[in-house]
Amino acid sequence: MAGLMKLACLVLACMIVAGPITSNAALSCGTVSGYVAPCIGYLTQNGPLPRGCCTGVTNLNNMARTTPDRQQACRCLVGAANSFPTLNAARAAGLPKACGVNIPYKISKSTNCNSVR
């Protein structure tokens, strides 16, 4: 039950963060949150890396093909990262590599998403 509450908070935080952002991106923070939701235990509780997490990271990377989409995904991930005080920063930064995915930015609480291309 606590995990569902955290997921609900994550989705809400992403929507609040992305609400005022105007862009041509097709990705919403709700979509991004759905892709990375299976990663929450890995990123906050030092749990094992679930297959569903890597599937979500791969699918998100495949959807974020344009610069606006990559910037929007980045903003959503930064917003989500900031909503979890127990986020393991090293695991978040290393998540793409752990899943065999190459993304053009570091997942962290302080990533400048405007510089993402």
Swiss-Prot record:
Belongs to the plant LTP family. Residues 1-25 form the signal peptide. GO terms for biological process: lipid transport. This is Non-specific lipid-transfer protein 2. Disulfide bonds join 29-76, 39-53, 54-99, 74-113. Plant non-specific lipid-transfer proteins transfer phospholipids as well as galactolipids across membranes. May play a role in wax or cutin deposition in the cell walls of expanding epidermal cells and certain secretory tissues. Pfam families: Tryp_alpha_amyl (PF00234). Transmembrane segments: none annotated. The keyword Heme does not apply. SMART domains: AAI. One of its GO terms (molecular function) is lipid binding. It comes from the Eukaryota. The keyword DNA-binding does not apply. It comes from Brassica napus (Rape). Keywords: Disulfide bond, Lipid-binding, Signal, Transport. InterPro entries: Bifun_inhib/LTP/seed_sf, Bifunc_inhib/LTP/seed_store, Plant_nsLTP.
